[in-house]
């Protein structure tokens, strides 16, 4: 697809989103060849991207919330920081995609081919995504596994107060289960921490 046509579709889509569907038109990019496209930061909220070729596309920080990406080819795509909440990714090929910091909360991933060592864990206090076996997103916090294992009590408390402090051991258990047992900070074993958690 040529860049002028794509720019027009994105412009009409932005108007459609901001006018609450009163004007403009929803982006219809079904079967579109967007291989290597630079869509960094694009607002594709609710867009139709079924079966689109987005291989190696730059979708960093893109808004793909509620987008229909059924069967899309996203191999090697840069999806760092992308908002994929409630997106339809059924049957999508995400092999080799970079999902660091991407928000997949509520995304339908049935039949999707995810990058190696990528897991989406539902049913916890926070939505959790383990990305490429290296990064973990819990709620709105995304850090390397090594960083999660070394955070101080104060750093965890700054994330979401007592709720985060109470959940932190569970998060480390989840990381251990999916990526292998690793170190834990000493403060987790302290009597002070145990007493603080009991008070809640």
State each model region's role.
Residues 4-21, 137-163:
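K/E-rich alpha-helical interaction surfaces of small helical-bundle regulatory domains
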Residues 99, 104, 109-153:
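Glycine-rich hexapeptide-repeat left-handed beta-helix
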């Amino acid at each position: 697809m040529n860049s002028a046509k794509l720019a027009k579709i994105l412009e009409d889509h932005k108007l459609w989103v901001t006018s609450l569907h009163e004007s403009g038109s929803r982006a219809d990019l079904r079967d579109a060849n967007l291989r290597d496209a630079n869509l960094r930061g694009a607002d594709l909220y609710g867009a139709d991207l079924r079966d689109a070729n987005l291989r190696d596309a730059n979708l960093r920080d893109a808004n793909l919330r509620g987008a229909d990406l059924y069967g899309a080819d996203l191999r090697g795509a840069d999806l760092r920081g992308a908002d994929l909440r409630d997106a339809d990714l059924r049957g999508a090929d995400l092999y080799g995609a970079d999902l660091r910091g991407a928000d997949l909360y509520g995304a339908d991933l049935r039949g999707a081919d995810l990058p190696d060592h990528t897991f989406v864990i539902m049913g916890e206090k926070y939505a959790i995504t383990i990305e490429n076996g290296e990064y973990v997103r819990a709620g709105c916090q995304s850090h390397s596994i090594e960083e999660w294992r070394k955070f101080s009590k104060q750093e965890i408390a700054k994330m979401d107060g007592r709720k985060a402090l109470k959940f932190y051991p569970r998060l480390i258990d989840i990381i251990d289960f999916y990526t292998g047992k690793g170190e834990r900070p000493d403060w987790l074993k302290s009597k002070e921490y145990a007493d603080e958690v009991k008070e809640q």
